[in-house]
A protein has these predicted regions:
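SAM-dependent transferase fold signal centered on methyltransferase-like domains
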Residues: 1-358
Length: 358
């Protein structure tokens, strides 16, 4: 049986049931939601045509009271092949403890542990978590699961639709995990295809030992990739392993990579994780403010840019003023290339770089 102890509408549960061909057990504390879930289960079963639906149940009750639920459902002692849960959680997950999820994770695992069928690597557990979970909270989740099943594998999965946002964070544990891939990154593309990286998660480190020079390339990389720690696998696709590269920034919304050569942007595995990339034309002599905008315009015109997009940290009030001034000042090169202005730390302090897109 596939168990979801907080099934809500039941759609995720029934999706797993249809995919695995196994009956499901959904538990819902809200009676109206339980009725909706039961109706959804019937609809999915009718569309799928499998035989799993005949033994699928939705129980109105407390998902942390395993014994009572199993008794009501008339199921044996260890009937659960897969436990999946997407607990309700506070919006600002980093400011709350894991036990503020509903149902609380530690209580849930403790209640169901003795009722999970265990294979060679432990039970199969899938937990959807807040995409904003901190590293410390992820470690806490691992500790909760590992306390009961010390040697079971664990796979953390990040899912992103782009724009530097993590759309889903899931932990796959025990029989549900990929024993060879502690981390997995899925990038969902608009055409329905998926770009996938998997392997060991490695924390990226910054290197601002020297100032970026004209002719080098700056690339803003999707922050979701660095959250997964799989940026080295991506980098091996992006440039030759013989070509040097270093991270100028690894946190925030604009992780910044410096390379000596352009990236292989014709490869979807590379381009799908790139926000913008360009060749450094010059370093701005003055910072982007109302006093320095004319100097930046001179450099942009010298690079024959038709547009220079601000990709640096600016106050919300100043950004549109400066962007309007740049747009107006670059009308003389309507057939020029696109460019961007990006900030980066250097050994001499903050720097701003004018880059031209390929």
């Amino acid at each position: 049986v596939v168990l979801d102890p907080a099934c809500g509408s039941g759609m995720q549960l029934f999706s797993y049931c249809a995919r695995l061909g196994r009956p499901g057990l959904g538990i819902e504390l809200d009676s109206d939601a339980a009725l909706l879930a039961a109706a959804n289960g019937k609809r999915v079963w009718d569309a799928d045509g499998g035989d799993w639906g005949a033994k699928t149940q939705v129980v109105f009750g407390d998902g942390t009271d395993a014994a009572a639920v199993l008794a009501e459902a008339g199921l044996p002692e260890r009937p659960i092949a897969v436990l999946h849960v997407d607990p309700a959680r506070p919006q600002d997950a980093q400011r709350h403890s894991l036990d503020e999820m509903q149902p609380p994770l530690s209580e849930l695992v403790g209640s169901w542990a003795d009722h999970l069928a265990e294979g060679p690597v432990g039970p199969a557990i899938i937990i959807d978590l807040s995409p904003r979970l901190s590293d410390a909270q992820r470690e806490e989740v691992g500790d909760i699961l590992g306390a009961r099943w010390q040697d079971s594998p664990i796979t953390w999965e990040w899912v992103s639709k782009g724009q530097g946002r993590i759309d889903r964070l899931t932990v796959w544990f025990g029989g549900a995990a990929d024993a060879h891939s502690p981390a997995r990154m899925l990038r969902l593309l608009t055409d329905g295809s998926v770009v996938r990286f998997a392997g060991e998660s490695i924390t990226a480190t910054t290197d601002i030992s020297s100032t970026p020079q004209p002719g080098q390339w700056l690339t803003i990389v999707d922050s979701a990739l660095l959250s997964s720690g799989l940026q080295q696998q991506w980098l091996r696709k992006a440039i030759s392993h013989r070509s040097p590269s270093r991270w100028l920034r690894t946190d925030g919304r604009r992780p910044l990579l410096l390379t000596d050569i352009p990236l292989r942007m014709d490869d979807p595995k590379v381009s799908s994780f790139v926000s913008t990339t360009g060749e450094i034309m010059s370093q701005a002599k003055l910072p982007p403010n109302e006093a320095g905008i004319e100097s930046i315009l001179v450099s942009a015109r010298s690079a024959y840019l038709a547009r220079l997009t601000l990709r640096c940290s600016l106050s919300p009030g100043l950004q549109p003023i400066l962007q309007q001034a740049l747009d107006k000042g670059l009308k003389i090169h309507p057939r020029g290339k696109q460019g961007f202005l990006i900030d980066a730390d250097t050994p001499d302090g903050p720097g701003w770089f004018i880059c031209r897109a390929p």
